Amino acid sequence: IPTKEDQYGYLDPTNLRSCYAESKRMAETMCVSWFHQYGLPTKIVRPFHTYGFGMSLDDGRVYADFVADIINDRDIQINSDGTATRAFCYIADATIGFFTVLLKGENGQAYNIGNDQCEISVFDLANRLINLFPDKNLKVIKNMVANDREYLRSNVSRNCPYITKVGNLGWRPTTSIEDGFTRTICSFLNYV
């Protein structure tokens, strides 16, 4: 880690959580197959933890849960030890990355889209987000046993993209965690 485009990792097909990653692999294989067999122009983007206005706040992703908690004036609950790290990319940066790949990328190739400079632990993200809105007087609570029976813990302790390949096309993300999440949370507060 950081994860390059040619690194596929190990997946246990008997693990319930593997269906998500396996379905993405299958879709990429189909796209590349159609490109090679039929000449269908295909470029693949692999987004890493993209957030921003319009994202679903109830899909179970940790950052969506945190944003929903802040919007609804709830303390942030972490259902783990909070040490897992993720690299978060603001939607405006990701969108520019997608268009960069579309316009400049090579057919049949995959490109990681993410912000390698915004890797942060779940616990630190929660604290940074509540510190963006100190007037709300929120706190972070570590809840080592999830209350939700449907909650599935991730066994991925670190997830960060290697973005040199798309960088060679001229793209780099520019939005910090503080700026991106402030914009995101304010957009929901102003929308509601």
Residue map of PLM features:
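Glycine-rich "substrate-gating" loop/helix at the edge of Rossmann-like oxidoreductase active sites
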Residues: 16-20, 48-60, 80-92, 115-118
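Positions that flank functional sites
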Residues: 50, 63, 181
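Catalytic helix-loop patch of NAD(P)-dependent Rossmann-fold dehydrogenases
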Residues: 1-44, 49, 56-59
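Histidine kinase transmitter module recognition
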Residues: 34-37, 54, 69, 169-173
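C-terminal substrate-binding subdomain of Rossmann-fold SDR/epimerase-dehydratase oxidoreductases
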Residues: 4, 70-192
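A general structural signal for well-ordered alpha-helical segments in protein cores
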Residues: 28, 63-64, 122, 126
